[in-house]
From Swiss-Prot:
GO cellular-component term (any): chloroplast thylakoid membrane
Protein name: ATP synthase subunit a, chloroplastic
UniProt keyword annotations, A-Z: ATP synthesis, CF(0), Chloroplast, Hydrogen ion transport, Ion transport, Membrane, Plastid, Thylakoid, Transmembrane, Transmembrane helix, Transport
InterPro entries registered for this protein in UniProt: ATP_syn_F0_a_bact/chloroplast (IPR045082), ATP_synth_F0_asu (IPR000568), ATP_synth_F0_asu_AS (IPR023011), F0_ATP_A_sf (IPR035908)
Highest taxon, organism lineage: Eukaryota
């Protein structure tokens, strides 16, 4: 008798398991995997910030270890990224935003590369990394757009919109088009790379023994990390551009 919980689902694209909420249809499988990713990040953060050991005098006995060391390394990495992209004056307030974006995309991408979501069969569609769904990547890109508009307007007020006619008024359509293409490029780049990686691995696993797809899976881990870094770096660059003083 076939066990529906451990049947390998077929590789499919564009099929969704819909949840009905009022008059709206929600992509259930995306919400499930997104909640799992958020839970994993939350647990790691909670465990990594318990019983914090302060460093005094560079002593090895008081140096952070384990998850605390990992969380401090990630925090310093995000802080340095924000400082490089946004600038010394404004970077600190944007560290939480860039850190959240980076961690969510990183863990989502790696969950798609490491967790065999497809062994769990759904009534329709299949489980996959949250970033394998265009709705997720578009939402992340729109959040980034809102963030850099907010950053620019909060610092410069309505004077922020002078950038659209700088250095010449005839550049107005081009500058508007640039702001429209930023979220498009962010969302489709991330979605396309993650979808392609999961499809290639899924097809290889179904056609050949498990050992053969391993190099592709390792490459997928590397690509997943790079995509998270690229998204966070571009988000920081866009915010830095919006708060930059033009003379």
């Amino acid at each position: 008798m076939t066990n529906i919980w451990f049947d390998v689902a077929e590789v499919s694209v564009g099929q969704h398991w819909y949840w009905q909420l009022g008059g709206y249809s929600l992509h259930g499988q995306v919400l499930i995997t997104s909640w799992i990713v958020v839970a994993v990040i939350g647990v790691i953060c909670l465990l990594g910030t318990q019983n914090l050991q302060p460093v005094s005098g560079g002593s090895a006995a008081t140096a952070p270890k384990g998850l605390q060391n990992l969380t401090e390394y990630i925090t310093e990495f995000i802080r340095d990224l924000a400082k490089t992209q946004i600038g010394e004056e404004d970077y600190l307030k944007w560290v939480p935003f860039l850190g959240t974006i980076f961690l969510f995309i990183f863990v989502s991408n790696w969950s798609g590369a490491l967790i065999p979501w497809r062994i769990l069969e759904l009534p329709n569609g299949e489980l996959a990394a949250p970033t394998n769904d265009i709705n997720t990547t578009v939402a992340l890109a729109l959040l980034t757009s809102i963030a850099y508009f907010y950053a620019g307007i909060s610092k410069k007020g309505l004077g922020y919109f002078k950038r659209y006619i700088s250095p010449a008024a005839f550049l107005l359509p081009i500058n508007i088009l640039e702001d429209l293409t930023k979220p498009l490029s962010l969302s489709f780049r991330l979605f396309g790379n993650i979808l392609a990686d999961e499809l290639v691995v899924g097809v290889l696993v179904s056609l050949v023994p498990l050992v053969v797809p391993i190099p592709i899976m390792l490459l997928g881990l590397f690509t997943s990390a790079i995509q998270a870094l690229v998204f966070a770096t571009l988000a920081g660059a866009y915010i830095g551009e919006s708060v930059e003083d033009h003379h």
